Amino acid sequence: MNPSPLLDLIDSPQDLRRLDKKQLPRLAGELRAFLLESVGQTGGHFASNLGAVELTIALHYVYDTPEDKLVWDVGHQSYPHKILTGRKNQMHTMRQYGGLAGFPKRSESEYDAFGVGHSSTSIGAALGMAVADKQLGNNRRSVAIIGDGAMTAGQAFEALNCAGDMDVDLLVVLNDNEMSISPNVGALPKYLASNVVRDMHGLLSTVKAQTGKVLDKIPGAMEFAQKVEHKIKTLAEEAEHAKQSLSLFENFGFRYTGPVDGHNVENLVDVLKDLRSRKGPQLLHVITKKGNGYKLAENDPVKYHAVAKLPKEGAAQMPSEKEPKPVAKPTYTQVFGKWLCDRAAADERLIAITPAMREGSGLVEFEQRFPDRYFDVGIAEQHAVTFAGGLACEGMKPVVAIYSTFLQRAYDQLVHDIALQNLPVLFAVDRAGIVGADGPTHAGLYDLSFLRCIPNMIVAAPSDENECRLLLSTCYQADAPAAVRYPRGTGTGAPVSDGMETVEIGKGIIRREGGKTAFIAFGSMVAPALAVAGKLNATVADMRFVKPIDEELIVRLARSHDRIVTLEENAEQGGAGGAVLEVLAKHGICKPVLLLGVADTVTGHGDPKKLLDDLGLSAEAVERRVRAWLSDRDAAN
């Protein structure tokens, strides 16, 4: 670990505030080096944290946290915040089972004012805190720190619209690095990027580079030039306020300050001290560089948005992509990405839509091959779904590639704009089930429950890679809204067909014939069901569809077996197991049923296998639970 004499003194923001302002740049260097070491060993979100070091230091230096509230949007950039708030010695546990969460978490620290993981919530939450403090007579300050990527979401503008009309002391810090995970899209980033002050800063840098050597040789010339430079910057900022800022943020009722260099920590402190003394809604526009201080991340912030691990020797570079890699099973995301390109090559009506998740959803190749049919709508899940509905109305075949956890954000659009009109939109729902290190904010544990109650909706859950392709092809051709949900990571290693074969909608298959116990399994839980079935001599049904569910198969299994076990990687409440119980009740069948799913609890973060075992859904845990259930029933009889 690199020496960090200043950082070693800090266990809380109170310690930070004892430092002289002139020591803060050195502290920023130490903190950035610590991040390189810690994230290099544990993995995690990387480039965004490197870009937020100086801003985080300045905020905690000026604001009286935890009395004053810092609300981080998304939370990707919260590692420096955690280091400065007493968690430095726990950073080696980041995103690991039982360790620090990868996002701010209220139960983890009093400095984590609001739990996050999804984008664009910070302004609304900070506004709520500011209103509460005003009602209670507290002299606190609330600060929302939001990136320009998150600012593209409608929720952020809803909060701005509301806050600007209120007499509350609220600061919104717009951390503008021209990125979300991928480069930003839409009109707002272009608006911010066209900033006159940015152009002026670039001009000044050029002039300084070309004249600096000459001015150095003239006594007093450099000092005079610096004063002129400062005056030009001031005039440019004032002109910018009049020309652009007044037309957007100030018309929302915010007093605009900026743009400010987000890596000049001393100047940030001065600006924030001034803003803290002001009344009413304020917006500070800060310019930062994602990955700042680490050249590889600066040059490729998408690749370095999150990393697994970095080499130990100074965390100097990522492993070379030219090194030979063992042939691995394809991930479900890769299976989807290949299917999408194959399908698009055969059908010019196919349109792919993603809400700012090009890489994560497997759309990189599609964008390269079919740029005119690729739409990244930004962090705007609601718009993505309604946009797809409009396309479907005119005969196009939209495919919305979206994570399960983010589909929750567009529920009304699913119902109102798609299902009630029975529009044929295909939702490729990635990251269904447990996701691991990102924890409960990113777990896809509710989609079966909230999708199967929607009229007209087809809901499918593949058990392996080949079935994923089959169900994608099947649901794409359906004249109805459909969702195919699949987990993160690799599957079972099943060979994947290159064809476009389909299966009958609403029909499952028997994967194993057994004795008196029937396993009715959905999606990712088919594999553990098969692993256990041989030991318990159980029949295994791969249901494939949650809606329409295969009533005929369920009834046949219930009548030919003494006991039924349902298995799903989804919440038990309202899930696939509940659908099985509804079928049994409808047909007047009374048989013992054990529902195996995720209980009514908030899951943790860490290794997915460990989490599944804790939830009773690993193969070993399923065997234990079923054996105990069978034993209890035998004892009762």
From Swiss-Prot:
Swiss-Prot/TrEMBL keywords: Isoprene biosynthesis, Magnesium, Metal-binding, Thiamine biosynthesis, Thiamine pyrophosphate, Transferase
Gene3D superfamilies: 3.40.50.920, 3.40.50.970
Pathway as given in its UniProt record: Metabolic intermediate biosynthesis; 1-deoxy-D-xylulose 5-phosphate biosynthesis; 1-deoxy-D-xylulose 5-phosphate from D-glyceraldehyde 3-phosphate and pyruvate: step 1/1
Cofactor dependence: Mg(2+); thiamine diphosphate
Gene Ontology molecular function terms on file: 1-deoxy-D-xylulose-5-phosphate synthase activity; magnesium ion binding; thiamine pyrophosphate binding
Classification via PROSITE patterns: TRANSKETOLASE_1, TRANSKETOLASE_2
Cofactor note: Binds 1 Mg(2+) ion per subunit. Binds 1 thiamine pyrophosphate per subunit.
Enzyme class: transferase
GO CC, alphabetical: cytosol
Chain positions recorded as Mg(2+) binding sites: 148, 177
InterPro entries per the UniProt record, alphabetical: Dxylulose-5-P_synthase, THDP-binding, Transketo_C/PFOR_II, Transketolase-like_Pyr-bd, Transketolase_BS, Transketolase_C, Transketolase_CS
Catalytic reaction equation(s): D-glyceraldehyde 3-phosphate + pyruvate + H(+) = 1-deoxy-D-xylulose 5-phosphate + CO2
Source taxon at top rank: Bacteria
Gene Ontology BP, a term: terpenoid biosynthetic process
Database matches in Pfam families: DXP_synthase_N (PF13292), Transket_pyr (PF02779), Transketolase_C (PF02780)
Binding site for thiamine diphosphate: 76, 117-119, 149-150, 177, 294, 381
EC number: 2.2.1.7
Function: Catalyzes the acyloin condensation reaction between C atoms 2 and 3 of pyruvate and glyceraldehyde 3-phosphate to yield 1-deoxy-D-xylulose-5-phosphate (DXP).
Family recorded in the similarity comment: Belongs to the transketolase family. DXPS subfamily.
Subunit relationships: Homodimer.
Protein name as catalogued: 1-deoxy-D-xylulose-5-phosphate synthase
Organism: Neisseria meningitidis serogroup C / serotype 2a (strain ATCC 700532 / DSM 15464 / FAM18)
Name of the gene this protein is made from: dxs
